[in-house]
């Protein structure tokens, strides 16, 4: 086909005028010198389309309005080539019919038609010549890319298989050492495979070139294909870099299935570190509870002291307890008559245990402290009630002192009378018993003094607070005074 087209092109050139041939030859030479990348056939086609004007062709090429046949624009150029072929065939048939119909015309008209045919052939057929070398280039490129893709897929699959083989850990240290050697051999074989694959890609690119422009086009295409083997080499370098990491991870960490894991002593210190922070909160808890127990001890001692005081009271004879209860009942009746708001307070006093004051403590009737009243007019009866309460406390203390003074001489007389009658052994036992009794009495007296000192202190503090509250709240309502009064009696 190419030989036929060349001969036909030469025949068409013969029909052209001498001036046209000279002009096209000079313009072609100029364009070839200016654009060595372009082929002469392509430049001639552009000249014929643009009426042999250099300026228009140069503008088209410089502004990239016209481009060469390149492998980047594959599909578009193929479609255009098919369209050009169909248009050329249609125009050729039309020209043949017109030539057969106009055979009887003049020679001048025949020459004009031949010139038109030559122009149409020059404008339409140069792209046909471009089809075959470009198609060959495209086929070669497709084969190259398919080969490169297959090589890259094989290399990636090989690397993935190698990594998969290296990932599963071995059950013993001997298996880990044995697996290292075939890995090195596999990497060497992969590197040897990648090198010939890149060489094959280079050989596929070396296609017999017919023209100088084709060599330049292939030189632009080669770096694109060279990038693919570079990527495959980089992919091979990655597993090589990761393999020493796998070695270090496989050797010092034997799994449970190996005998080395059973002998390894590294598992012992781990539970110690876990168990240390656990007892710390347990130790802190008893430390927090210890002061609570210490605080509870004095409360228990006070509770134990109170029944001891109560135990002393039954020692007294029942006959002498009656005058003690009589003034208490009379005092309660007097307090009930004095004011209407105090029966609840008197009931609280009756419920509380009797306070036994020590003999050495002086009686205090009044210290110049006066309590406030619930109302402005009811000040005198409250003062009278307070004096009665003080008198009842003093009356309770006096018979108790008399009872103790009467009991002491009776006990001494009994001891001295029995001392002469009993034998020596009984005397020794009585002496021990007397010493123990005296010691117990001394302890009881000390406890009584401690217990009695506490309520007296509370009473004095409450009276002081009451006097302060009455002075500060002289202008307030009666409800606030009542609340303060109730609190003071509850504290008693």
Swiss-Prot record:
Keywords: Chromosome, Cytoplasm, DNA damage, DNA repair, DNA-binding, Nucleus, Telomere, Ubl conjugation, Ubl conjugation pathway. Residues 23-66 form the CUE domain. Residues 1-12, 126-140 have a biased composition (Basic residues). It holds the Pfam family CUE. Residues 180-191, 282-292 have a biased composition (Basic and acidic residues). Residues 202-216 have a biased composition (Acidic residues). Signal peptide: none annotated. Its main location: cytoplasm. InterPro entries: CUE. Residues 16-25, 91-109, 148-164 have a biased composition (Low complexity). It comes from the Eukaryota. Ubiquitinated. GO terms for biological process: DNA repair. Homodimer; may form higher order oligomers. Interacts with the large RNA polymerase II subunit RPO21; the interaction is direct and serves to bridge RPO21 to the Elongin complex in a manner dependent on transcription stress. Interacts with RAD26. Belongs to the DEF1 family. This is RNA polymerase II degradation factor 1.
């Amino acid at each position: 086909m190419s030989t036929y087209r060349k001969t036909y092109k030469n025949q068409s050139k013969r029909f052209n005028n001498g001036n046209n041939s000279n002009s096209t030859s000079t313009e072609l030479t100029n364009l070839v010198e200016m654009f060595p990348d372009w082929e002469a056939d392509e430049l001639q086609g552009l000249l014929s389309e643009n009426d042999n004007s250099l300026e228009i062709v140069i503008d088209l090429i410089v502004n990239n309005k016209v481009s060469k046949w390149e492998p980047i624009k594959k599909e578009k150029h193929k479609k255009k080539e098919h369209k050009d072929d169909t248009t050329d065939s249609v125009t050729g048939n039309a020209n043949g019919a017109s030539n057969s119909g106009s055979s009887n015309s003049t020679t001048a008209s025949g020459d004009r038609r031949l010139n038109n045919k030559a122009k149409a052939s020059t404008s339409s057929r140069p792209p046909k010549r471009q089809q075959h070398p470009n198609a060959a280039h495209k086929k070669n490129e497709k084969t190259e890319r398919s080969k490169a893709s297959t090589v890259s897929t094989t290399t990636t699959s090989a690397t993935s298989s190698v990594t998969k083989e290296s990932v599963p850990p071995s059950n013993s240290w001997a298996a880990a050492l044995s697996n290292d050697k075939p890995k090195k051999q596999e990497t060497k074989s992969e590197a040897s495979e990648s090198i010939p694959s890149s060489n094959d890609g280079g050989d596929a690119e070396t296609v017999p070139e017919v023209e100088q422009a084709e060599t330049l086009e292939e030189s632009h295409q080669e770096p694109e294909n060279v990038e693919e083997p570079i990527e495959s080499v980089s992919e091979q370098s990655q597993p090589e870099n990761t393999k020493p990491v796998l070695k270090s991870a496989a050797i010092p960490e034997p799994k449970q299935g190996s005998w080395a894991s059973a002998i390894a002593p590294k598992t012992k210190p781990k539970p110690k570190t876990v168990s240390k922070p656990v007892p710390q909160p347990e130790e802190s808890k008893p430390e927090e509870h210890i002061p609570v127990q210490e605080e509870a001890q004095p409360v228990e001692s006070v509770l134990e002291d109170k029944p001891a005081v109560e135990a002393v009271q039954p020692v007294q004879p029942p006959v002498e307890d009656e005058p003690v209860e009589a003034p208490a009942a009379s005092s309660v009746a007097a307090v009930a008559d004095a004011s209407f708001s105090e029966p609840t307070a008197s009931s609280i006093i009756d419920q509380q245990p009797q306070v036994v004051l020590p003999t050495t403590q002086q009686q205090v009737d009044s210290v110049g402290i006066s309590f406030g009243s619930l109302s402005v007019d009811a000040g005198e009866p409250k003062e009278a009630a307070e004096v009665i309460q003080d008198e009842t406390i003093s009356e309770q203390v006096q018979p108790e002192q008399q009872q103790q003074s009467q009991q002491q001489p009776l006990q001494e007389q009994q001891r001295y009378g029995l001392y002469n009658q009993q034998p020596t052994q009984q005397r020794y036992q009585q002496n021990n018993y007397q010493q123990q009794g005296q010691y117990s009495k001394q302890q009881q007296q000390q406890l009584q003094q401690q217990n009695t000192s506490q309520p007296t202190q509370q009473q004095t503090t409450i009276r002081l607070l009451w006097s302060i509250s009455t002075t500060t709240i002289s202008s307030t309502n009666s409800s606030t005074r009542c609340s303060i009064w109730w609190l003071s009696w509850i504290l008693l």
